Curated annotation (Swiss-Prot):
Name this polypeptide is given: Ribulose bisphosphate carboxylase large chain
Family note: Belongs to the RuBisCO large chain family. Type I subfamily.
Cofactor(s) named in the record: Mg(2+)
GO biological process, one term: photorespiration
GO molecular function, a single term: magnesium ion binding
Annotated site residue numbers, Transition state stabilizer: K334
Pfam families cross-referenced by the UniProt entry: RuBisCO_large, RuBisCO_large_N
Length: 475
């Protein structure tokens, strides 16, 4: 035997490669209340047994590597390893299965979504033995979630700050998203807020470009907010996008927003990164700023049914990292989102305790204990005819955000805002009177048109607009 391959049997170490399932597939394991649990949709390469593929996922996302190593004997693998504890078939898919993996809590740094994701999804998704892999859900135990601050303020504190109750909030993304000067941008903000909206918004890619530097935009938007508040008597806000190329620059922009006295800032949490997002969330809580979160880049990660991560996982990660709002699809607009799936992760964002419900894609019971909730934002291709459905689907604790559905009004920005506010108030009143918005919604809107010419004009311009494409991500 060559010295390079000699086995040191005398010290209990046997070199070589062995099947993952011999160590990491443990169907007899009883999960602990402190374990982080994961549900993976696994598509193995032909010839790879489900037990081996599931064990490989557990190994490569925890303590394992491709071969036995001498240093395994210097720690307790039984204490620290991930375990594939259950495998179930995927109905209608002969080549796929769900692998359930339990991770001991000590594998993860406290209060770090960055470390959590680096471990669970950082390397294993490129594993050759797998044709595809998707993380469908995570169970975050209270013993781990309590190490996070979570949202800077949460739903109830936001309502108290705004003094607005009993209805969804209304927003608008300023369009065109790129190319306006700071002064013209501020003008559009003022007109929309004066017309009745609660918020206006920077689009996700509005940062600090040559045509509109961030400081100029912040100043003109703050002026627009103050003017609209003075005229309407309502508290208004504009999501000032603080996303930047460095964390230091991001915080500098948030500091300037606070100095201007605005109520809310914004961050692109996936392109900006979880470390940056958590830092900004901590600053916002310490300084009384609300934090709006855009999910730009999410579809790169979550849209494919067989590979990547489901948005419910990204939503849970955001709740821990911190944000008071997050975009969550519309069900009825131009962006992807099936109703039951969307409402499943909306509950994961807002509620304290969510029961396991596979009919809505929720694989685990989730207890957030005292962590504040996040308000879902419905945005993307919506207009006044969608208002009854949006009110019925998302309920009061949501933001309904109309960009083109405000600024595309034939009479201008302020009438577009008026149309949306009238439509919302009509839907809320009808719901409170016991009317069924799902069945009577169009009639509610038509009745409101009789005393709102702005709404009537909006209804006429968008009466034929629909986005009727089949969704990709079904249960």
């Amino acid at each position: 035997m060559s010295p390079k391959t000699e086995t040191k049997a005398s010290v209990g170490f046997k070199a070589g490669v062995k099947d993952y399932r011999l160590t990491y597939y443990t169907p007899e394991y009883q999960t602990k209340d402190t374990d982080i649990l994961a549900a993976f949709r696994v598509t193995p390469q032909p010839g790879v047994p489900p037990e081996e593929a599931g064990a490989a996922v557990a190994a490569e996302s925890s303590t394992g590597t491709w071969t036995t190593v001498w240093t395994d004997g210097l720690t307790s693998l039984d204490r620290y390893k991930g375990r594939c504890y259950d495998i179930e078939p995927v109905p209608g898919e002969e080549t796929q299965f769900i692998a359930y993996v339990a991770y001991p809590l000590d594998l993860f740094e406290e209060g770090s979504v960055t470390n959590l994701f680096t471990s669970i999804v950082g390397n294993v998704f490129g594993f050759k033995a797998l044709r595809a892999l998707r993380l469908e859900d995570l169970r975050i135990p209270p013993s781990y979630s309590k190490t996070f601050q979570g949202p800077p303020h949460g739903i109830q504190v936001e309502r108290d700050k705004l003094n607005k109750y009993g209805r969804p909030l209304l927003g608008c993304t300023i369009k065109p998203k790129l190319g306006l000067s700071a002064k013209n941008y501020g003008r559009a903000v003022y007109e929309c807020l004066r017309g009745g909206l609660d918020f206006t918004k920077d689009d996700e890619n509005v940062n600090s470009q040559p045509f509109m530097r961030w400081r100029d935009r912040f100043v003109f938007c703050a002026e627009a907010i103050n003017k609209a508040q003075a005229e309407t008597g309502e508290i208004k806000g504009h999501y000032l996008n603080a996303t930047a190329g460095t964390c230091e620059e991001m915080i500098k922009r948030a500091v300037f927003a606070r100095e201007l006295g605005v109520p809310i800032v914004m961050h692109d949490y996936l392109t900006g990164g979880f470390t940056a997002n958590t830092s900004l969330a901590h600053y916002c809580r310490d300084n009384g700023l609300l934090l709006h979160i855009h999910r730009a880049m999410h579809a790169v990660i979550d849209r494919q049914r067989n590979h990547g991560m489901h948005f419910r996982v990204l939503a849970k990660a955001l709740r821990m990292s911190g944000g008071d709002h997050i975009h969550a699809g519309t069900v009825v607009g131009k962006l992807e989102g099936e109703r039951d799936v969307t409402l499943g992760f909306v509950d994961l964002l807002r509620d304290d305790f969510i029961e396991k419900d596979r009919s809505r894609g929720i694989y685990f019971t989730q207890d957030w204990v005292s962590m504040p909730g996040v308000m879902p934002v419905a945005s993307g291709g919506i207009h006044v005819w969608h208002m009854p459905a949006l009110t019925e689907i998302f309920g009061d604790d949501s933001v309904l955000q109309f960009g083109g559905g405000t600024l595309g009004h034939p009479w201008g920005n302020a009438p577009g805002a008026v149309a949306n506010r009238v439509a919302l108030e009509a839907c809320v009143q009808a719901r409170n009177e016991g009317r069924d918005l799902a069945r009577e919604g169009n009639e509610v809107i038509r009745e409101a048109c009789k005393w709102s010419p702005e709404l009537a004009a909006a209804c006429e311009i968008w009466k034929e607009i629909k986005f009727e494409f089949d969704v990709i991500d079904r249960l």
